[in-house]
């Protein structure tokens, strides 16, 4: 079974890592690439960067750090469409001293730690549980094609990479590169400034009209962080937690809609619209009839 494309969305990525067993970590959108915006997040573990891949532009700015591969998790991307989950794991598995990875990822890290990057990538691709969690967030598509073809210059290919701080070094972890890319020394306190500088330099290589970038922060769960904050009153904590709870409910609903295939409903509704030439007064009854007919045809 192949890996499917999943949407670059904070709710998708947060549910994905929770389904893999990770505790008290969330992924959130970064709407502005500046130091103040980054510092609003509690305990940042890394940043996921999505961009339109271009072989002419995407050349490493830092230094290939081959010596680091014995001490950090770095996997080559050998499986199509796995780069989203691979970017997430590139951050999570390199912060296992700070993050509760859960059984699945802890066992995967232990199993793969002595493997070279190519075999780490193969091990990830062959992990049925990780692949199933990843694929569970694919949009429902009734017209699935098993055809596999190489991308052409006309195709728009998007790619995920990770930025993270490991042992006071700022790394770029890209499964399409030969090794981790070292961007120089960086303490935890310097992470925001370093991240802004490195990512802005990369974006500057693109055409000024190119705006198809997406940034997400992997950080400590905001609700868990709020519960331990002593600078907030109980009322302030309750209000902030309510906002986080509402956000999670919205994410859950959106993920449910992503998984659902509405084609059958639309087909049945279209049939009735054409057949009956309904007017506004019969819309609701026609809609309910279409729903019922669609439901009766669904497989158990």
UniProtKB/Swiss-Prot annotation:
Pfam families: Peptidase_C12, UCH_C. The record marks 77 as: Transition state stabilizer. It comes from the Eukaryota. Its EC number is 3.4.19.12. The active site is at residues 83, 159. Residues 2-220 form the UCH catalytic domain. Residues 261-290 form the ULD domain. One of its GO terms (cellular component) is nuclear periphery. Disulfide bonds: none annotated. This is Ubiquitin carboxyl-terminal hydrolase 2. It comes from Schizosaccharomyces pombe (strain 972 / ATCC 24843) (Fission yeast).
């Amino acid at each position: 079974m192949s890996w499917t494309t999943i949407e670059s969305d904070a709710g998708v990525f947060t549910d994905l890592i929770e389904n893999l067993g990770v505790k008290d970590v969330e992924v959130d959108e970064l709407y502005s690439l500046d130091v103040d915006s980054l510092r609003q997040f509690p305990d940042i573990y890394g940043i996921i960067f999505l961009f339109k891949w271009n072989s002419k532009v995407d050349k490493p700015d830092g230094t290939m750090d081959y010596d680091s591969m014995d001490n950090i998790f770095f996997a080559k991307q050998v499986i199509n469409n796995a780069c989203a989950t691979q970017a997430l794991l590139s951050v999570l598995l390199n912060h296992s001293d700070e993050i509760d990875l859960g059984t699945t990822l802890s066992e995967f890290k232990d199993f793969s730690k002595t493997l070279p990057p190519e075999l780490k990538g193969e091990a990830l691709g062959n992990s049925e549980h990780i692949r199933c969690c990843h694929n569970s967030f694919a949009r429902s598509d009734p017209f699935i094609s098993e055809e596999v073809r190489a991308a052409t210059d006309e195709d728009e290919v998007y790619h995920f990479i990770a930025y993270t701080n490991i042992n006071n070094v700022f790394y770029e972890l890209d499964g399409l590169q030969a090794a981790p890319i070292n961007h120089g020394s960086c303490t935890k306190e310097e992470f925001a400034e370093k991240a802004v500088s490195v990512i802005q330099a990369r974006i500057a290589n693109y055409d000024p009209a190119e705006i198809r970038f997406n940034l997400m922060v992997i950080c400590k769960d905001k609700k868990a962080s709020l519960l331990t904050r002593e600078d907030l009153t109980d009322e302030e904590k309750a209000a902030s937690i309510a906002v986080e709870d509402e956000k999670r409910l919205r994410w859950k609903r959106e993920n449910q809609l992503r998984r659902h295939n509405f084609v059958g409903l639309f087909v049945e509704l279209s049939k009735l619209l054409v057949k009956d030439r309904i007017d506004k007064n019969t819309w609701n009854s026609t809609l309910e009839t279409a729903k019922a007919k669609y439901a009766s045809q669904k497989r158990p």
